[in-house]
């Protein structure tokens, strides 16, 4: 068996990086557009043209926050043979359809809990099965900024991953049912990975005009980790005193619990948080890539489990599953990613070339 997700190495100016990306992933970018065109129409009643028009309102905040992202998106569009508006809409997809969040299970493992004294960051990405065919791995040289290694949806400029300064990020989609014109979460992803210091990474959440809701789990190779829960109007930072820091798709901070909307949609978020915490306990002091993958492959309450499988009783468009799982070792600077369900393995290592 081999890794199914293509590894695309990017370098040069932002536009040049995008051009390489779009050219290498043109078919997958087209698949991303087709997937979200269908999803927007089915769940939000939006045509793709309307989605592109809605995405335009986020262009100004993106330009102000991270202008290189705009240039990179333009390069992706040219390379993939699609419009810039198409790529902008992909990168704003969570804000266009914020009422339908991804479901993910995240854990950060600190040195005192790992087998080798390393810091690990891991998660499942629970979304719709067609997204599996859109997955790419990006190795991005962007001097003078840190070099990045991340897993993303084709056409996106941000995703879960880490940089060569030891900063890593994972994401849980959350919702209070409110959104504003601001910086979309996939752009925040990239802003976080562009930093060299944990506090600077946290500042990307705390100092930025945020468009929506979410929780970025940000960790460093120095053994620090925080869940940065946020809404458009506020944020909170959650941490741990040594045990794995775990998060799913409901707010944990008292600041936001009363306004949480996902709890009405995904009751399994409570089950998954309970299981990922409990399943990791027997491995405290022994947590490494293999044991973390075992935790992510937990099947309690299957199909609505940490390793989530499609529920055939749900309408086809509502069937969520673990598209893949990823484990990042922030010290050895290697990520392991599965082609599909973590229970099926194997996890393939990917490093900077």
Name every feature range the model reports, one short phrase each:
Residues 186-194:
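Short histidine-centered catalytic/ligand-binding loop motif
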Residues 1-103, 193-235, 241-353:
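C-terminus-biased signal that marks the final domain/tail of proteins
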Residues 92-187, 203, 323, 335-337:
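Internal mixed beta-strand/loop scaffold within catalytic domains of large alpha/beta enzymes
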Residues 123, 160, 190, 272-277:
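Basic side chains
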């Amino acid at each position: 068996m081999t890794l199914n997700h293509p590894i695309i190495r990017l370098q040069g100016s932002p536009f040049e990086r995008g051009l390489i990306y779009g050219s290498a992933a043109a078919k997958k970018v087209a698949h991303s557009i087709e997937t979200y065109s269908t999803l927007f129409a089915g769940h939000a009643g939006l045509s793709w043209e309307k989605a592109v028009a809605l995405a335009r309102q986020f262009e100004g905040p993106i330009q102000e926050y991270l202008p290189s992202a705009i240039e990179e998106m333009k390069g992706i569009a040219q390379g993939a043979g699609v419009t810039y508006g198409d790529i902008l809409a992909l990168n704003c997809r969570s804000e266009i359809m914020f009422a339908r969040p991804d479901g993910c299970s995240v854990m950060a493992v600190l040195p005192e809990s790992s087998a080798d004294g390393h810091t690990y960051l891991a998660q499942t990405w629970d979304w719709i099965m067609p997204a599996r065919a859109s997955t790419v791995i990006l190795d991005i040289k962007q001097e003078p900024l840190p070099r990045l290694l991340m897993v993303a949806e084709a056409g996106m400029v941000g995703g879960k991953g880490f940089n060569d300064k030891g900063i890593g990020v994972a994401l849980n989609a959350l919702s209070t049912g409110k959104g504003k014109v601001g910086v979309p979460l996939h752009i925040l992803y990239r802003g976080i990975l562009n930093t060299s210091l944990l506090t600077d990474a946290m500042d990307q959440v705390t100092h930025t005009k945020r468009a929506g809701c979410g929780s970025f789990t940000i960790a460093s190779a120095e053994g620090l980790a925080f869940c940065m829960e946020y809404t458009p109007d506020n944020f909170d930072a959650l941490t741990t005193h040594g045990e794995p820091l775990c998060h799913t798709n409901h707010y944990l901070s008292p600041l936001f619990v009363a306004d949480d909307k996902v709890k009405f949609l995904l009751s399994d978020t409570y089950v998954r948080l309970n299981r990922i915490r409990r399943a990791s306990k027997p491995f405290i002091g022994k947590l490494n890539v293999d044991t973390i993958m075992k935790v992510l492959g937990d099947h309690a309450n299957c199909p609505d489990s940490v390793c989530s499988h499609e529920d055939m009783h749900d309408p086809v468009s509502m069937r969520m599953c673990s598209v893949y799982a990823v484990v990042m070792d922030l010290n050895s600077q290697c990520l392991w990613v599965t082609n599909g369900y973590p229970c099926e393995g194997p996890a393939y290592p990917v490093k900077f070339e």
